[in-house]
Swiss-Prot record:
Gene of this entry: fluC2
Protein function: Fluoride-specific ion channel. Important for reducing fluoride concentration in the cell, thus reducing its toxicity.
UniProt activity-regulation remark: Na(+) is not transported, but it plays an essential structural role and its presence is essential for fluoride channel function.
Recorded topology in the membrane: Multi-pass membrane protein
GO BP terms, alphabetized: cellular detoxification of fluoride
GO molecular function annotations of the record: fluoride channel activity; metal ion binding
Taxonomic placement: Bacteria, Bacillati, Actinomycetota, Actinomycetes, Kitasatosporales
Listed name of the protein: Fluoride-specific ion channel FluC 2
Amino acid sequence: MTVPHPESVGEPGIAVRAPARRRSAWHGQAPVVAVVALGGGIGGTARYAAALLWPTQSGGFPWTTFWVNVVGCAVIGVFMVVITDVWPAHRLVRPFFGTGVLGGFTTFSTYAVDIQKLVDAGHPRTALAYLAATLLAALAAVRLAATAARRVLVRRRR
């Protein structure tokens, strides 16, 4: 079998054009990935600083991780109200702050590891209390913060 030569491909006398190149999906997503990475670095650094400032004793209730997650959830509640009801944010603000900064700051993976460490250290009741308290407090924080932010907005608009 022979390889066709460009001058012999297609019908004689008809110009053959190469298909137009499509922009890759990466081209449009690169700025989003970049701001998420930048925000994640900032949020993760803030969480690490909190862990250094308020270390958890071995076998003790992981208060730092608990409060980091609760505060992060409260901030996301306010943030979502602000960018949906108040301020038409740039398309990169939500991925930077919501996914990046707050995603890096809150740490549900450390939450899971803390639960396992408590169980392994012989503190299953503390682990169960931590599991339930974090879940309930985080959900309540989002709800209460979003509700409070909306109420503030209603009062300001009067």
